[in-house]
Amino acid sequence: MSKQKVVVGMSGGVDSSVTAWLLKEQGYDVVGLFMKNWEDDDDSEYCSTRQDWIDVVSVADLIGIDVEAVNFAAEYKDRVFAEFLREYSAGRTPNPDVLCNAEIKFKAFLDHAMSLGAETIATGHYARVRQNERNGRFELLKAFDHTKDQSYFLHRLNQAQLSKTLFPLGEIPKTKVREIAEQIALPNAKKKDSTGICFIGERPFRDFLNRYLPTKPGPMKTTDGKVVGEHIGLAFYTFGQRKGIGLGGSKDGSGEPWFVAGKDIASNTLYVAQGHDHAWLLSHTLSAGNTSWVAGEPPADGFACGAKTRYRQADAPCTFSSAGSGEGLFELNFDAAQWAVTPGQSAVLYDGDVCLGGGIIEHAVTGQPVAREPQKAALLNAR
């Protein structure tokens, strides 16, 4: 009886390396595939593509599997990076990792794996997949280790993708994964986890963005219309941002920090608010579009669920309702006010551990006070 062939996405990190080893131990015919999704800056200190490939080859040799590299840079720039720049240009804050998973790691990669004769693919993501015995649908669940759960980034995966996907680390705590890596003497056992957006690396984000988007200085105003400074360009700020604004405590002596509270694209104005719990930063309601549902259909109107509006956030109790426009929009009404709900980010819904899917945040209704210049007080969440 032939072994089931699985192609593992290997990045050179500990998680994907242990994933490959676990599947080999379970009797699968394992092939490693290293994806190169970004070509610029390979000679700089910020990108470690060459070293990552060396680590992949070393791990593959140790555990006894074949490995190959495939270049998806063109697909990445077309399907992910171009959208990333469009969103920032529009004053929003996108999450490219969500789009990368849906378009590259579980589409381009999946298609390539199938062309190699694979029956399934696997990655080192911390999440789980199961098939519902009652209706036969595949479900995306949070990882056993909730502190490492990555279902937020995977919420746009569909039934076809999930049916061909394995997440071996979904039931294992991160600490155990590290232990396994050391026990089997993986050459990268002590390698640090990657952080940040893959094509940016560890460089300052503003420096990277400035290479692709021009600066366009404009007024920085308080929520009541008082000019307090100048910004370098709306694309370089995100809702709720504290660092890099260039404002200290106010002259009224309150000394509370300032936060980005809104953008008006038409007048190129950046609005700032003082105090973490300022009304302009708190929202009870959001609307989202560009939806994707794991089951292929949205929840019923009035469904009580939990939602995350950013990664690592605890599920916030809320009620789901369709916007009734027929365009795939939905609204969430939260039981408690949410802080800095940011357009461009994903609102992801959960029923306990089950990830239902979600959409891209379009607008959040804040408890903002009346501005002196209401016609210019279009918040960041006004597209």
UniProtKB/Swiss-Prot annotation:
<feature type="binding site">
    <location>
        <position position="124"/>
    </location>
    <ligand>
        <name>ATP</name>
    </ligand>
</feature>
<keyword id="KW-0808">Transferase</keyword>
<keyword id="KW-1015">Disulfide bond</keyword>
<keyword id="KW-0819">tRNA processing</keyword>
<comment type="function">
    <text>Catalyzes the 2-thiolation of uridine at the wobble position (U34) of tRNA, leading to the formation of s(2)U34.</text>
</comment>
<dbReference type="InterPro" id="IPR046885">
    <property type="entry name" value="MnmA-like_C"/>
</dbReference>
<keyword id="KW-0547">Nucleotide-binding</keyword>
<dbReference type="InterPro" id="IPR014729">
    <property type="entry name" value="Rossmann-like_a/b/a_fold"/>
</dbReference>
<feature type="active site" description="Cysteine persulfide intermediate">
    <location>
        <position position="198"/>
    </location>
</feature>
<feature type="site" description="Interaction with tRNA">
    <location>
        <position position="125"/>
    </location>
</feature>
<dbReference type="Pfam" id="PF03054">
    <property type="entry name" value="tRNA_Me_trans"/>
</dbReference>
<protein>
    <recommendedName>
        <fullName>tRNA-specific 2-thiouridylase MnmA</fullName>
        <ecNumber>2.8.1.13</ecNumber>
    </recommendedName>
</protein>
<feature type="binding site">
    <location>
        <begin position="9"/>
        <end position="16"/>
    </location>
    <ligand>
        <name>ATP</name>
    </ligand>
</feature>
<feature type="binding site">
    <location>
        <position position="35"/>
    </location>
    <ligand>
        <name>ATP</name>
    </ligand>
</feature>
<dbReference type="GO" id="GO:0000049">
    <property type="term" value="F:tRNA binding"/>
</dbReference>
<dbReference type="GO" id="GO:0005524">
    <property type="term" value="F:ATP binding"/>
</dbReference>
<dbReference type="GO" id="GO:0103016">
    <property type="term" value="F:tRNA-uridine 2-sulfurtransferase activity"/>
</dbReference>
<feature type="active site" description="Nucleophile">
    <location>
        <position position="100"/>
    </location>
</feature>
<feature type="region of interest" description="Interaction with tRNA">
    <location>
        <begin position="310"/>
        <end position="311"/>
    </location>
</feature>
<dbReference type="InterPro" id="IPR004506">
    <property type="entry name" value="MnmA-like"/>
</dbReference>
<dbReference type="GO" id="GO:0005737">
    <property type="term" value="C:cytoplasm"/>
</dbReference>
<dbReference type="GO" id="GO:0002143">
    <property type="term" value="P:tRNA wobble position uridine thiolation"/>
</dbReference>
<dbReference type="Pfam" id="PF20258">
    <property type="entry name" value="tRNA_Me_trans_C"/>
</dbReference>
<feature type="region of interest" description="Interaction with tRNA">
    <location>
        <begin position="148"/>
        <end position="150"/>
    </location>
</feature>
<dbReference type="InterPro" id="IPR046884">
    <property type="entry name" value="MnmA-like_central"/>
</dbReference>
<dbReference type="Pfam" id="PF20259">
    <property type="entry name" value="tRNA_Me_trans_M"/>
</dbReference>
<feature type="region of interest" description="Interaction with target base in tRNA">
    <location>
        <begin position="95"/>
        <end position="97"/>
    </location>
</feature>
<comment type="similarity">
    <text>Belongs to the MnmA/TRMU family.</text>
</comment>
<keyword id="KW-0963">Cytoplasm</keyword>
<keyword id="KW-0694">RNA-binding</keyword>
<keyword id="KW-0820">tRNA-binding</keyword>
<keyword id="KW-0067">ATP-binding</keyword>
<feature type="disulfide bond" description="Alternate">
    <location>
        <begin position="100"/>
        <end position="198"/>
    </location>
</feature>
<feature type="site" description="Interaction with tRNA">
    <location>
        <position position="345"/>
    </location>
</feature>
<dbReference type="InterPro" id="IPR023382">
    <property type="entry name" value="MnmA-like_central_sf"/>
</dbReference>
